[in-house]
């Protein structure tokens, strides 16, 4: 297992701050099982896998963006259903009074 350096990652990312954000988001996705690693796992933790993927030149944000879009759609649906249920409960309470 080769050591991952910040310099290796910065060849593919604009700055250190962007590197931290991208690696953290990708590590979170890997940890939750939302995606398969693009490099061999080699018994590494998700944060190291994310950094190795970035150092290898993979676009780690592409899958994350697709997943975030799906999550937003799901969140909107959940909010809409919750609002409907709240209205139904409120109208039921009003009719009881």
Curated annotation (Swiss-Prot):
InterPro entries: DNA-dir_RNA_pol_omega (IPR003716), Pol_omega/Rpo6/RPB6 (IPR006110), RPB6/omega-like_sf (IPR036161). Its EC number is 2.7.7.6. Disulfide bonds: none annotated. One of its GO terms (molecular function) is DNA-directed RNA polymerase activity. Coiled coil: none annotated. The keyword Transcription applies. HAMAP family: RNApol_bact_RpoZ. The RNAP catalytic core consists of 2 alpha, 1 beta, 1 beta' and 1 omega subunit. When a sigma factor is associated with the core the holoenzyme is formed, which can initiate transcription. This is DNA-directed RNA polymerase subunit omega. It comes from Coxiella burnetii (strain RSA 493 / Nine Mile phase I). The gene is rpoZ.
């Amino acid at each position: 297992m080769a050591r991952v350096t910040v310099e290796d990652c910065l060849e593919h990312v604009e700055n250190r701050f962007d590197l931290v954000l991208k690696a953290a988001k990708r590590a979170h996705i890997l940890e939750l099982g939302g995606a398969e690693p693009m490099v061999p796992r080699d018994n590494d933790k998700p944060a190291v896998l994310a950094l190795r993927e970035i150092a290898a030149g993979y676009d780690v944000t592409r899958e994350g963006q697709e997943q975030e879009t799906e999550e937003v759609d799901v969140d909107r649906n959940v909010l809409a259903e919750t609002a409907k249920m709240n209205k139904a409960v409120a109208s039921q309470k009003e009719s009881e009074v």
